[in-house]
Amino acid sequence: MNLTPREKDKLLVSLAAIVARGRLERGVKLNHPEAIALITDYVVEGARDGRSVADLMQAGAQVVRAEQCMPGIPEMIHDVQVEATFPDGTKLVTVHHPIR
């Protein structure tokens, strides 16, 4: 299987999100990369499902709660920017203050 660098990046984010979900299920608090991966994966999958940029900007801020993260992590993440493929092309989605 020949994957482009972009496809490899998408797979790594998806795998990191799977690991993060498993840790949440076990009650383990998320670190910085895990929280980013969950939000990013949510936006990418939502785009593939045909949701709007505005919808994903709002909904992306509800994926991870502050109490699910290690101390200090919510304050470290101000914005998450995701380049996602929508039915009408690739767009940049910015989730402001993603962990509340």
UniProtKB/Swiss-Prot annotation:
Pfam families, sorted: Urease_gamma
InterPro entries tied to this protein: Urease_gamma, Urease_gamma/gamma-beta_su, Urease_gamma_sf, Urease_subunit
GO molecular function, one term: urease activity
Protein keywords: Cytoplasm, Hydrolase
Enzyme Commission (EC) number: 3.5.1.5
GO cellular component, one term: cytoplasm
Pathway listed: Nitrogen metabolism; urea degradation; CO(2) and NH(3) from urea (urease route): step 1/1
Enzyme class per UniProt: hydrolase
Compartments, as annotated in UniProt: Cytoplasm
Enzymatic reactions: urea + 2 H2O + H(+) = hydrogencarbonate + 2 NH4(+)
GO biological process: urea catabolic process
Quaternary structure annotation from Swiss-Prot or TrEMBL: Heterotrimer of UreA (gamma), UreB (beta) and UreC (alpha) subunits. Three heterotrimers associate to form the active enzyme.
Family assignment from sequence similarity: Belongs to the urease gamma subunit family.
Name of the protein in its database record: Urease subunit gamma
Species of the source: Dinoroseobacter shibae (strain DSM 16493 / NCIMB 14021 / DFL 12)
Gene: ureA
